[in-house]
Amino acid sequence: MAAAAAGDSAVPNWVMLERLAFRRDDPASFREDRRTFASGTTSTGTQFDVSFILAEPPTPSRLYLSWPEGPKQESRGLVMAANRNLVLLRLDSLIDESDPFGEVVHDYFIYIADPSSQWTPLLRRLPPCTEYDDYFERQVTRVLPALAVGLLCHGEDEFAVAHLDIRSRKKKSGSRKKKLPIQAELCVLRSSLSCSDDAKWETKILPIQYQYDDLSSDFLYWSVDGVVPFKNALCFVNYCRGILFCDGVFEDSPKVSYIRLPLDTYIRGADGEARKGMYHGLCVTEGGHRLVFVDVARHDGKSYGPSMPNTGFTLTSRTFKMTGNCTTPWQWNEDAVVTSDELWHANTMESLPHDIVMLPLLSMDKANVAHLSLIDWDGGFSLVSIDLSNMQVMGPVITYLKGKDDTADADIVEEKKGLCAHFIPSEFPKFLDLRKRENHP
């Protein structure tokens, strides 16, 4: 069935997951690794297969999707989130392909890498998250933004899938007390791997804690650029503003705090935020014990496109710390500041092209190792790893997508123009029981 049975290579300790699924219904182009292969069924009864093709960072790991019975138009497969041995997937499809403005079904699946319970990974379809639609006059699948859904594991069995948004607070009549005029709306499904019968979505309205005087622009046209699991919390981050830090997701009353990002070079609420966010990254490193914000500041002040002549960038990393102080319960401590001049002086042009780096992601194991993306502004996509402690490039530049000349992955090149988001770090490969599958192709 597979174009290449990629099951003989070593498995990385952690991987960088591409968000876009490579749908390849033709058996000749569907790539399969038997160690990561799984099958599932959508809510409409169609069968599909998935397989992750694993790669050592900075090369992204891809999810290949074979869905011959699935819709041919207006369909998409996405990797939504990951934590420990679980990965959250979503398949989108129109119920009626003849109506491009009709109802879209979003099926969520938990991909489970659990060597103790089965020979190969499993796919479990989650119950739908629904809401009433005035147009259809009935309950329909709730549309959760592609970048705004998080996944969090608790213990060996429990997990939660969550989306957090903001909503206006209703003022009490006659009230003069000055309060933040918004609340957090948490939509969460809590379940367990051992039992899924009682899993259901819940909506909770929660207050937001903060330590700032003026938040007038922070939540204006708020959107989430990514969700990062950190210890017992989910960080819903807007890369040009701050983090909605949702702690205690598995408790009856989770706590939501707003934490500003240390954005020294940007104006909050400025135009072009979606593209400016591509120069920032919130990373969990050192085995999940450290939360670090990485900021790449362009010297030319542009939000996108090739850099101006004779300009570069400054990369700064800062670690998030809880202080225990009631007045200022958290702070950002500067770890490293590296300029492009220093990097370019320490490395050859061939090993590190003189261009802007984007989508920074630190290694899940080592805080000094940064994986950075290079875009040629014509759809081409490359990656490079740098040791920030000595500013040395680690290995060659990896060509990921060839841009307009990439005929094999032309669909992904086109889709990335609309969803060029951060890669998702995941350690699920180390939960694969490779011994069980070595002799079972």
Where are the language model's segments positioned?
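Short loop/turn segments immediately following beta-strands, especially the blade-tip
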Residues: 115-118, 192-196, 247-253, 317-331, ...
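A sequence/structural signal of beta-propeller blade repeats
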Residues: 74, 80-305
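Extended serine/threonine-enriched, polar tracts that run as long, contiguous segments within proteins
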Residues: 289-320, 329-333, 341-353, 366-369
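Conserved blade-ending motifs and adjacent loop-strand segments that build the rim/top face
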Residues: 264-271, 275, 330-359, 395-409
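Acidic/polar, low-complexity linker and loop regions
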Residues: 44-67, 181-218, 336, 345-348, ...
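A surface-exposed beta-alpha-beta supersecondary segment
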Residues: 134-154, 327-372, 424
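General structural concept
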Residues: 2-162, 374, 382-387, 397-399
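Blade-level signature of beta-propeller repeat domains, shared across WD40, Kelch, NHL, RCC1
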Residues: 369, 376, 382-441
